[in-house]
Amino acid sequence: MKEQKWIHEGLITESLPNGMFRIRLDNEDMILGYVSGKIRRSFIRILPGDRVKIEVSRYDSTRGRIIYRLRNKNSKD
């Protein structure tokens, strides 16, 4: 049976080495996130200040996988 995961939204606050990011979730928790393979293959740039969707394991809620970068309302792309 596949493990159930929580999906949260958050804000990238800091960029760390090796594709890791510090993320502040909407519920004010700080977690460590890494970029998923699809985002890495698509060369999607993730920078501090971006809003992202993150998938968090039920067993370790301090780490998560970034699965989607949300569009900024004021950007042209």
UniProtKB/Swiss-Prot annotation:
<dbReference type="Pfam" id="PF01176">
    <property type="entry name" value="eIF-1a"/>
</dbReference>
<protein>
    <recommendedName>
        <fullName>Translation initiation factor IF-1, chloroplastic</fullName>
    </recommendedName>
</protein>
<dbReference type="InterPro" id="IPR012340">
    <property type="entry name" value="NA-bd_OB-fold"/>
</dbReference>
<dbReference type="InterPro" id="IPR006196">
    <property type="entry name" value="RNA-binding_domain_S1_IF1"/>
</dbReference>
<keyword id="KW-0699">rRNA-binding</keyword>
<keyword id="KW-0648">Protein biosynthesis</keyword>
<comment type="subunit">
    <text>Component of the 30S ribosomal translation pre-initiation complex which assembles on the 30S ribosome in the order IF-2 and IF-3, IF-1 and N-formylmethionyl-tRNA(fMet); mRNA recruitment can occur at any time during PIC assembly.</text>
</comment>
<dbReference type="GO" id="GO:0043022">
    <property type="term" value="F:ribosome binding"/>
</dbReference>
<dbReference type="InterPro" id="IPR003029">
    <property type="entry name" value="S1_domain"/>
</dbReference>
<keyword id="KW-0934">Plastid</keyword>
<comment type="function">
    <text>One of the essential components for the initiation of protein synthesis. Stabilizes the binding of IF-2 and IF-3 on the 30S subunit to which N-formylmethionyl-tRNA(fMet) subsequently binds. Helps modulate mRNA selection, yielding the 30S pre-initiation complex (PIC). Upon addition of the 50S ribosomal subunit IF-1, IF-2 and IF-3 are released leaving the mature 70S translation initiation complex.</text>
</comment>
<dbReference type="GO" id="GO:0019843">
    <property type="term" value="F:rRNA binding"/>
</dbReference>
<keyword id="KW-0694">RNA-binding</keyword>
<dbReference type="GO" id="GO:0003743">
    <property type="term" value="F:translation initiation factor activity"/>
</dbReference>
<feature type="domain" description="S1-like">
    <location>
        <begin position="1"/>
        <end position="71"/>
    </location>
</feature>
<dbReference type="GO" id="GO:0005829">
    <property type="term" value="C:cytosol"/>
</dbReference>
<dbReference type="InterPro" id="IPR004368">
    <property type="entry name" value="TIF_IF1"/>
</dbReference>
<keyword id="KW-0396">Initiation factor</keyword>
<dbReference type="GO" id="GO:0009507">
    <property type="term" value="C:chloroplast"/>
</dbReference>
<comment type="similarity">
    <text>Belongs to the IF-1 family.</text>
</comment>
<keyword id="KW-0150">Chloroplast</keyword>
